[in-house]
């Protein structure tokens, strides 16, 4: 009966009535402790990361565990009497702590700092690495299959470096073609100019060579035809022709000479006489 006044003093301080009908004070104190723990667990507000850093979270966990642990001989007796209820209380407190941590992580994720505040687990890292390796292996296998198909068909993939080289080669070939065309045109022009120069030179040479021959022919033709009544030379001096056709040809050629053209400018009678004299030669 020594424990009853202590329990009564506690209940009187809380404003409750004293126990009636001979109820045991231990049951009341046990119910009060369970109610207090439950109300404390569900009455807590979800904290934010800005207001509650990691140290405060650790202090809260220590305080809750301290509240669960027995403080005096009365609490030790209560724990010894009902161990199942005590285990339930402990599990409930652990659940509350886990819920608080989850809510804090959700707040951090909403604020935009999920990867800084929540470090990844080793198992998650291994899984992610395995996924990356499998993806790389699949890509390599696809690349190898495509290369084998291309080699089987006899083609090769066009790399960017090959494309650049091909473009440069095409540009160089186009420049060479343009250059060759220009050179060919210049060569043709030069050849034409050289041919023209050669023709001019040959024409000049022929003109120079033909001028003394014409002068000699003119001098020979002018000598017997100096006067209209002049007679032809002696038969000894006249050339001997074998046939009449040769005479006609010779006369025709002499008819077309410059001297005869000059003679044609005179009177008709003079021209007739000259022509007859030429035909009788």
Curated annotation (Swiss-Prot):
Disulfide bonds: none annotated. Residues 1-80, 110-147, 167-248 are annotated as: Disordered. SUPFAM superfamilies: Moesin tail domain. The modification Phosphothreonine is found at residue 234. Residues 262-281 are annotated as: Binds actin. Pfam families: Ermin. GO terms for biological process: actin filament organization; morphogenesis of a branching structure; regulation of cell projection organization; regulation of cell shape. The keyword Phosphoprotein applies. Binds actin. This is Ermin. It comes from Mus musculus (Mouse).
